């Protein structure tokens, strides 16, 4: 592939505020002494301009926490200052498509090594790049992978994740998935810490990217993806996890096996389990401290995730357990089969789990005195 790599220094943009001084509408010029007085009495610093967009993912390591957004770049949490720090202020207008961060991961052995998968179908020539930082986002290197995969970080399914992962046993090995591919596979890998990338042809031979579409729609640039149009469900690879020498890859398709596993470095991908659903799509895979996979499913990528499930899979024993949360109605407990955004484990206790629904609209039923006004909160549920 033609690989573009750039070293980028993260600079903070400064905003200069100008204040007019006058009396009764009459402009009065400032003398040198007045200007000196103002300069000495003011504190001058950069203006903090907060980012925007949908926060589509948060990842944590031992010491660092990062967030990604669909149009506002990526952030690192400053625990001392108790604020989020923008990491992508170096991007210019021509590269604004990279503010759509489709996926991210850290090296499990080093929180300061961060990878961001970025791209937007309708900005910056629909280019896709992986940004690598080895200093917690202070500086980045850009590796262009457009000729292998393409992503739309502001597209449907962007809440799924993460579609990039580092092998904890060998951090030079990284797997990354796209929404679309102009090459032979929607899954790529690096064996040199992200310097170079190649297609994983074994995944490509599964023929999960079966539709050929124009990307973007107003061009003649042909790609293969998992849906008939990019703005309705072309989410491609939704989630990747690497553990115990195996790579697990979830794909946003229905009607066939959509969660596959292979030995790291192998092209022999197989369905993980016949017991897993095929009429829903994997949304996220997390690990508990015992090495079990916590897998969640959704039925839609847009504003209603529909039905779904949650599972725990033991890769050592191949045991699969349905851990979908339950609700109680009229004294009877039943599975709440709605779309789930993820199940997360306490880093030190695999028995402590938190599950969250995805794109559901529930009354939270908090008591009125828990809020500033007498109203009911609406949103997703936590278990």
Where are these regions (language model features)?
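Juxtamembrane cytosolic interface motif at the C-terminal end of transmembrane helices
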Residues: 23-27
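Extracellular glycan-interacting surfaces
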Residues: 28-383
